[in-house]
Amino acid sequence: MGRDKDGNVAMHWAARGGNVALVRLLLSRNCPIDSQNDANETPLHWAMRAGTRGMAVVQLLVESGARANLYSRSYKRPLDVAAEGFRDQDNDDNDRALVAVDPQERRTTRWNMLRYSSQCRTLVLHHHECLDHMAKSHHDWEVPDRIDSIMSTLASRTFASCPPQDDSKFNSCEITVSNEFERATLELLSRIHSADYLAFVNELSKELDRKRKQQLLENVQNSNDSSEMSGGLSQEQHHIVPFTPMIQKKFIKEAKTKADGHSDTSFSAGSLKAARRAAGAVQHAVDWCVCLLESAVLLRVVLVGRNRNAFCVVRPPGHHAGINGLLSDAGSCGFCLFNNVAAGAMHALSDEKHRPRCERCAIVDIDAHHGNGTEEIVRKCHDSGRLLFFSVHLYDCDKPKKTNEFNYKFYPGTGADDDVPHNVINVPIAPLWREKEVIKSICTPTNGNGSAATERAQTRLKTKADSRVSSSTDLKSMSGNNEQQIGDELQNAFAAKPKSQLPTSSPHYPPHYLMGVGRLAYRRAIQHRLLPALRAFNPDLIIMSTGFDAARGDVGNARHYVNGTQAMGLDLEPEDYAWTSRKICEVADICCNGRVVSVLEGGYGRTPPSIPPPPLAEPTSSEEVRQPLEKGFFSECAMHHLKGLVDPYAE
């Protein structure tokens, strides 16, 4: 088989020129369809590089058995180089026009391939049983409408044929939406939770189900007596009970428990099924992203995923659920029943006949709250060297606790330090309500230069326009030049300070103040703490605890006061979630063939602008909210996150 100086065969050149007849002829002569050149690129890579002129060849190659999951030396699949041209191949003037990638041509070329290669699509999992976990009222934070808002927004933006110039929409060939998966088994849940906790939840569910059925029967009888056939259950008749106080009494053995009216976490007759279905979604996603498929063309078993990655749109969330559900120092279950991501990780690390074993799994938690339950499970894992837990979160706790009283100022008040022996990396971020203290911690009052540098930096972009960046924000400038410039200024400010004034040596300035506040601090945590750690750990699978409660205006990252005011702790934009997804997917392409499973955690919505913020009894409660939260921005963040999973290399 003849090759040119770069290792290309005739099939590469035929694909590059979009010559369908020649490609068909070469296939009839048994020319290798997946022959790789010196850059490890196949003819399918080259057909995709050619843009629209190679679309017919892409269809022919895929239908003839070309492997769409092969990576080049730059860790890209054919789908990832759509319409990029051949800028590094030669000096052909005809191909120079392709150096600047046309976004519309790129999307058109991608959609063409995705129509014939379903394994490159993103899997979106949801299930109606997740709606049966009922909250105390429709105006609570963690409600079924969270799932409905995401799925309805996705449905309204998904089209079989959408214009390539509109990058806010999804083509139906980019995603596979499914509700065909089983509930998590008791055996799987027993790997992460204690037998006593599982038995308690099961008995509670049976008791509430008996009451629900009895109530239905009484309703039917009353309807017959009054000749009104209503028969359904009202919100008050669902027998919803406060969950946190029950766990405190059963497992924590506390004399003083959370008041029932202040319990954010509820349990209803449908909660157990919903929680098992949520964990089952992650289990299913792991199996579909890491599996064995029989290739009839190659006559061998190859390691590929049926989907490139997955997004589990499920509830109740789980990252606060520890071995016994509630952790002794948490004060609240944080809306969580079973730890979905931990269940998925343990399933991935187990031996399964139908798929290869994952030797290492990384859990990345980007929720505004520390994943204390996940950390506890990872710490207790019998082989923690196979697990990595990373969490970036808000942290505000002035002093260590000296009593049993909860004195944290932002739930759950944990996650201040790393635990290197157990592969736990915590990156706490100071909330925006501490911004003045953060600025002061890196200021040098006696040094004008240091103060000026800090004034320019301030760890997040100074102006209101920058702190309220719209969807037109240039992500590259945000994560590149701007961040580098501000980082340099901060470093100069630190260098100018006397050693005695460094935050690490002062009890008034905690070490995590060095990260700064807001969006820039968050991006620094991802860029400089997460990505190097992921690359070094080299996982076979990455599972994301994806909470959207760090978004600007979300009640989940706010500090609520009894006078009705609230102070926001983070200000992430939808673009930040897309950027995070893409960065993690880029590392996943290097380490684990792009295997990423994202699982919905927090994110609740905003207080409607026409309604003043309601007074809350404590920072973690939502019982006083009188109107449903506005979920448009929450859904927008979810859509951008999904966009990052669907197309990690979008410009």
Regions found by a protein language model. Give the residues of each.
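HDAC/HDAC-like amidohydrolase catalytic core signature
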Residues: 99-364, 368-651
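Ankyrin repeat domain, specifically the short helix-to-loop turn at the C-terminus of the second helix
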Residues: 24-32, 59-67
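Conserved ankyrin/ankyrin-like repeat signature
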Residues: 21-22, 56-57, 90, 94, ...
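Ankyrin repeat A-helix N-terminal signature
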Residues: 13-19, 46-54, 81-86
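Alpha-helical adaptor scaffolds
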Residues: 5-6, 12-16, 21-29
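Leucine-rich solenoid repeat scaffolds
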Residues: 62, 68-103
